[in-house]
Amino acid sequence: GRRAERLKALQDELGADRFHPCVFDVRDEDVRDKALDGLPEAFGQIDCLVNNAGLALGTEAAQESDLDNWKVMIDTNITALVSLTRKLLPMLVERKGAIVNLSSVAATYPYPGGNVYGGTKAFVHQFTLGLRSDLHGTGVRVTSIEPGMVETEFTVVRTGGSQQAS
């Protein structure tokens, strides 16, 4: 995650022996790998990967959208998810773990301005199905959660910080 103060509060609540926060941008593979490789021994064996990092930027029609926003969504919602999953797959197979990918109903229900975001979530859905097929028989469980509209900070980010628009 990237919300250090919230993660620290959760660690305080759960205890440092039960929760070790890692704060980094999932798009930065070097920083991510250092964080994972530097985990304390008690947290070095991962049983469950929850790919929850994701974002949607902008609400404009495709022809008016900012290409840089599209690239950030693809890098976060697809590239980082695939890269992190691949890095942890050997350990998850060894431990018969679980992978939970956060997709969205936007994967199958298009809406104006949701072009690239919906495309990234369609990828997550299909990637989950492919992983489940590849990992069949290994004991690794793979699932995708595809929520609809949920009142979170996510929509505030999408609308550029406008609580009212979200």
Predicted regions and their residues:
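The beta1-alpha1 cofactor-binding region of Rossmann-like NAD(H)/NADP(H)-dependent oxidoreductases
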Residues: 5, 23-34, 67
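Conserved NAD(P)H cofactor-binding loop of Rossmann-fold oxidoreductase domains
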Residues: 53-58
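Substrate-binding pocket helix/loop in short-chain dehydrogenase/reductase
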Residues: 60-62, 66-71
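Active-site helix of classical SDR
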Residues: 85, 120
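Residue(s) in the substrate-gating loop at a strand-loop-helix junction
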Residues: 104
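Active-site loop immediately N-terminal to the catalytic Tyr-X3-Lys motif
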Residues: 111-115
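SDR active-site lid
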Residues: 126, 132-166
